[in-house]
Regions:
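Short, well-ordered loop/turn and helix-capping segments at boundaries between secondary-structure elements
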Residues: 166, 170, 281, 285, ...
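Short hydrophobic alpha-helical segments that form membrane-spanning helices or hydrophobic packing faces
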Residues: 146-149, 275-276, 386, 527-532, ...
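Cysteine-centered catalytic environments shared across enzyme families
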Residues: 1-331, 343, 347
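Adenosyl-5′-phosphate
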Residues: 1-10, 14, 52-53, 200-205, ...
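Glycine-rich active-site loop/lid subdomains used to bind and stabilize high-energy intermediates
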Residues: 4-9, 42, 47, 68, ...
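Short helix-capping/linker segments at secondary-structure and domain boundaries
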Residues: 9-14, 82-84, 108-113, 132, ...
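Phosphate/ATP-binding catalytic cores across multiple sugar-kinase/actin-like superfamilies
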Residues: 242-264, 364-371, 375, 497-505, ...
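Hydrophobic (often cysteine-bearing) scaffold residues that line and stabilize catalytic clefts
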Residues: 15-18, 95-98, 117, 174, ...
Length: 649
């Protein structure tokens, strides 16, 4: 893998000091094994190499061969390298760097080479003959790439944002991005797929490439999930289950390819557990270990009903079953989740809402690197693919499609297993699904209405903020809490903003800690398999999350696999840690709010009367009865910290 950056000036010579500044930011903020550069007056390309796989030891980019008039670099791990090697005439045993393979494939196929690549990649190509720059993103933007068109007509691109803001120092904040962050509900920091907190700096969209000339910047789409079909046979349940497991294993096998050790960020959830189990089985055949890392509370916590607050026991059951899993239980040394806020913001370069999760992930990645791991597996996309399948989603879909016999059969089977009254369940389902049908039928027809749910946000934030246009244009629909039927599921799978955000997270964390984060549940083949699969199979015959439950009967301990009602709660002690350290934390939070109140750019966004009232009521001890209020305050705290960091840099 790599970090890539560069600048094309179509008219004037590029300032070499600006190029040096870009390089320095990568040297000081990323764990890179080598940095190579190419400079030729109006062209500058930089590339930092991470030696993750054996082929990357010989990687040397940018590639600039005068005979071809092409400057080429890529941030990539290619999963179908053997196919590409064969097409290019290499022997099976030849060790060829992935970047070199892509370069030669581009020379052979030109831009059509994108139809033959599978893996993680962001690519920059400059063609001297027609004075054109191509910037390319893979189908899910798993490697982020930013770009900025300067007022001088030049184009700057970079894996990280700061090298661009260092080269062009007067880029203003994008107020709409910050308002989106504060106004939209949920843990996503962004609602747009391509915008950033800096006006004019954009991210590449999934499955697209840019064509940049002196006159224009044009985005072209080359990937369409509707046309990308990995499986044509969903004949029956046995075929689906068997095909799914084989495909899942292939995705994991590709993900664990590395010259170093492999780690997994593991819980007892079905997605990360199965990813880890498959990885352990594959690595065991090579006499290698899987290093697993599980976050657990600092002090023991009792489960609340079906909610598992401490996953130590269940994870240990998995570890006991697979001797080559080397388990580690971590708790961030008992630190509070906002102690490392500045560090997280410096890595991510955007404000974040998942402030609870990030510090613990940083600890996992840092420890994995120290243990010699170059790949860290995750299953965070699993709820959209391998472990999708809440029973309500499939039952509602069958009901709305008028598949009443199948609906009743699934409902009866489910109720029998969980020992629930079928009569009561049927009555509740019909009432719930009729409501869902009504909500969906009027969605998009009713007048746009949206109430900001963050109590600390002032209505003044709506000034010069086209909320309706931004929500509608970016396909953000907030309706009642209803089941996800097939059409809504497919709409979600196509939602680009989620992919570009996850790409930012995985790319930047990987560069910071010297690893590559890979999620087999987000492999484009798995996304395609699930997207095109008949929806009923997600909870086939009334079995929630049927894909995993049907195909991992021997691999997952029965207490985990067959307990349909269990739900693991991650970071369960985050609020108790906040309360424990509140007397210390509230001092800084008060100072931060005073700073915000005096900042002309931010002060109009917030209701300081409510903020000060909350802080006054909780001055001595944090009341945990209203966790939503705590989160809402932390989002404001995060934005203010982000603004301060941007000022300093």
């Amino acid at each position: 893998m790599s970090a890539i950056w560069g600048n094309i000036s179509f008219d004037t010579e590029i300032d070499q000091s600006g190029c040096r500044n870009m390089r320095v930011l990568y040297e000081t903020n990323c764990k890179l094994d080598h940095i190579y550069e190419y400079y030729d007056r109006k062209i500058y390309f930089g590339c930092g190499i991470q030696e993750i796989i054996r082929e990357s030891v010989n990687e040397n980019m940018p590639i600039a061969e005068d005979k071809n008039a092409i400057i080429f670099e890529a941030d990539c791990i290619i999963d179908n390298r053997e196919e590409i090697k064969q097409e290019l005439g290499y022997s099976q045993g030849d060790i060829v760097p992935d970047g070199r393979l892509l370069y030669e494939l581009y020379l052979k196929e030109k831009i059509n080479f994108l139809t033959k690549i599978r893996g993680m990649y962001a690519i920059a190509i400059y063609d001297k003959n027609d004075d054109t720059l191509y910037l390319i993103s893979d189908p899910i933007s798993s490697r982020c790439l930013y770009y900025y068109r300067g007022t001088d007509g030049g184009i700057c691109f970079s894996t990280l944002i700061r090298p661009i803001t260092e080269f062009y120092k007067d880029i203003p904040f994008n107020s709409n991005y910050i308002k989106d962050f504060l106004v939209a509900p949920g843990l996503m920091p962004n609602i747009t797929s391509d915008e950033t907190p800096h006006k004019g700096i954009y991210k590449l969209n999934p499955g697209t490439y840019l064509v940049v000339t002196r006159e224009s910047v044009e985005e072209r789409e080359y990937f369409d999930i509707d046309k990308y079909i990995i499986c044509n046979d969903y004949t029956n349940a046995d075929v689906v289950s068997d095909t799914f497991k084989k495909l899942y294993a292939e995705c994991v096998k590709d993900a664990v390819y590395t010259s170093g050790e492999v780690a997994s960020s593991m819980s007892s959830g079905l997605d990360s557990a199965t990813t880890s189990i498959l990885a352990a089985q594959i690595l065991d055949k090579k006499s290698k270990k899987l290093f697993s890392y599980t976050y657990v509370p600092e002090n023991k916590m009792k489960n609340k009903g079906n909610k598992i607050l401490d996953e130590t026991v269940d994870v240990q059951k998995i570890l006991d079953k697979y001797p080559n899993m080397k388990g580690h239980f971590v708790n961030n040394n008992g630190k509070c989740c906002i102690d490392d806020m500045n560090k997280v913001l410096e890595i991510m370069e955007i404000p974040i809402k998942a402030y609870v999760n990030f510090p613990n992930l940083c600890e996992i990645y840092e420890k994995a690197h120290k243990h010699g791991c170059k790949i860290v597996l995750t299953g965070q996309n699993g709820n959209s693919t391998v472990s999708h399948g809440y029973i309500d989603d499939v039952l509602c879909d069958l009901y709305i499609k008028k598949k009443y016999i199948t609906f009743l059969r699934y409902l009866n089977s489910y109720c029998k297993t969980v020992k629930e009254s079928r009569k009561a369940a049927l009555k509740g389902c019909i009432r719930y699904f009729r409501h869902t049908k009504k909500v969906l039928s009027i969605a998009g027809k009713r007048k746009f209405e949206y109430e900001i749910d963050n109590r600390f946000i002032s209505q003044n934030i709506m000034n010069d903020y086209p909320l309706e246009i931004r929500f509608v244009d970016n396909d953000i629909t907030y309706v009642d809490n209803i089941p996800t039927i097939e059409s809504e599921y497919k709409r979600f799978i196509k939602h680009q903003a989620l992919y570009t955000y996850l790409g930012e997270f995985e790319t930047k964390m990987g560069l910071k800690y010297g690893i590559v984060i890979r999620d087999p549940t987000a492999d484009i083949r798995m996304i395609s398999f699930c997207y095109h699969m008949p929806y009923r199979y997600f909870a086939y015959n009334g079995v929630p999350r049927w894909l995993i439950r049907s195909s991992f009967t021997r691999e997952i301990p029965n207490e985990i696999l067959n307990n349909w009602m269990r739900y693991g709660v991650q970071n369960a002690d985050c609020y108790t840690r906040l309360r424990r350290d509140w007397k210390r934390l509230v001092v800084d939070i008060n100072k931060q709010m005073q700073t915000v109140e005096s900042d002309k750019r931010l002060c109009e966004y917030f209701d300081f009367e409510k903020i000060n009232s909350f802080l006054s009521d909780n001055q001595k001890e944090l009341d945990l009865k209203d966790e939503a209020a705590i989160d809402q305050l932390m989002y404001i705290y995060c934005v203010s910290k982000f603004y301060q960091l941007c000022k300093k840099s």
